[in-house]
Amino acid sequence: MQPDNRKTILCYGDSNTYGYDPQDGLRYAEDIRWPGVLRQVLGNGYRIIEEGCNGRTCAHTPEDEEWKDGRPYLKACLNSHKPIDAVVLMLGSNDLKRQFAAEPETLAAGIGWMMSTIAEFLQLKQGSVPYILVVSPPRIGEGITSSPFADSFEADAAPRSQRLASLYEKTAFDYAQETMNPCGFLDAASLIEPSQIDSLHLMPDAHQVLGTAIAQTLRAFL
């Protein structure tokens, strides 16, 4: 049997990584959601692990749905898929729900905690630190208060989501400066918009753009 020399990329995110379809509430086909696009663009030399969960958070524990907290599951996920060459983190939108009343700075701190946890855990378990690509999520649209998710979000979720990019970029920069570990940053909101259907989830064309951009960023490093 030939050894598997492919680079392993773990995509850790929420419903927009899962591939939630705002048109029917189901899941996009593998070739439509952005990790699938990433797989197509990068080609055979890469193994793409899709770890998207609807409602996943980066800094809070959802009431009655603690399993959606992305922090406790992170180490088990990493251990299941190691060795890992790169991790793509795109989280934060669900932390802006009304039940948390969170400031964007809290979300950036959650992302920073995840970056440190990934680096320290995989250094211990596989003897190397993966490249971490922090992707600030697409903004939440102004129409969120009249969308199917209006009960979950306040009107100020939209402007708060617009503050994430600069905070996440600083978090990634600080991590790189402090640890000298490899990492990158991508602002999804500069490339794509959420659907007009629910002001939160992505349409197929946005998945195509995002997956291609992430592939280009990863290819430059890996």
Residue ranges, per PLM feature:
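Alpha-helical cap/lid subdomain in secreted, periplasmic
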Residues: 2-5, 68-222
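Serine-esterase "nucleophile elbow" of acetyl-processing enzymes
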Residues: 1-53, 59-64, 76-81, 87, ...
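N-terminal start-of-chain detector that recognizes signal peptides
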Residues: 20-22, 58-62, 104-108, 151-152
